[in-house]
Design a protein with these regions (language model features):
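Short beta-strand scaffold segments in enzyme catalytic cores
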Residues: 48, 96-100, 108
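Short, glycine-/polar-rich solvent-exposed loops and beta-turns at beta-strand/coil boundaries
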Residues: 90-92
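Short Asp/Glu-rich motifs
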Residues: 69-70, 95-96, 177-178
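Glycine-rich phosphate/adenosyl-contacting loop at the front of the ribokinase-like
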Residues: 1-62, 67-81
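Ribokinase/PfkB-type carbohydrate-kinase core domain
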Residues: 1-12, 74-88, 101-205
Length: 205
């Protein structure tokens, strides 16, 4: 099967509640309007959106061996995403986030790291993973085994094969620029948020 895009990186389960004005004190209960489960992450959310737009997508990432993984994989398949390169890892949970969505749209997050920290790509998988013409890497900063030199080598190999490369991270801090700057020569399109761009560049505008 030929794919339009390979979407590599962070696949997580998001639990969204809205609107959340405050966490109730003690063991009290606060009623909200909606709770939803979604596939998220700067790879997971991206691949779902691309599939909705009609692209033939290959998902490349890792989930755990739990009920959260069942939901992530079933949802990807429901949208027609090829999950043949998704790794299901025993002994670790699927990475997941609780998002308390405020009325103004702010989304403070509680994240539990999991399978994405153990995700890596074997050399034997490169032909399949890098076969599509577009390669997206998303989630740098929360991909412990893939971050740094493995990501640089992956993107360099993608460019050596003539692929278009796109890149997104997840959050930014004082160490982010050092982490991602070796990747820049191998990235065609980098898509940080405004907040991430300010943090990385040190610019106010």
């Amino acid at each position: 099967m030929s794919h339009d895009v390979s979407v590599i990186g962070l696949y997580i389960l998001d639990v969204l509640g809205r609107p959340v004005d405050a966490i109730p004190p003690g063991g009290n209960v606060e009623f909200i309007d909606e709770i939803r489960l979604t596939v998220a992450g700067t790879a997971g959310g991206t691949v779902v959106d691309l599939a909705k737009l009609g692209l033939n997508c290959l998902a490349v990432g890792a989930v755990g061996d739990d009920e959260k993984a069942d939901f992530v994989l079933a949802t990807l398949q429901r949208f027609g995403v090829d999950v043949a390169q998704m790794q299901r890892l025993k002994g670790v949970p699927t990475s997941s986030t609780i998002l308390n969505i405020r009325r103004n749209g702010d989304r403070p997050a509680l994240h539990a790291r999991g399978a994405s920290d153990h995700f890596e790509i074997a050399d034997s998988a490169l032909d399949a993973v890098l076969a599509p013409p577009i390669i997206h890497l998303g989630g740098t900063g929360l991909l412990a085994k893939l971050d740094g030199e493995p990501s640089r080598k992956l993107l360099a190999e993608a460019k050596a094969r003539g692929r278009i490369t796109t890149f997104d991270l997840l959050g930014a801090n004082d160490g982010t620029l050092d982490l991602i700057s070796p990747l820049f020569p191998h990235i065609d399109y980098f898509m940080p948020s405004i907040e991430e761009a300010k943090q990385i560049s040190g610019a106010a505008d």
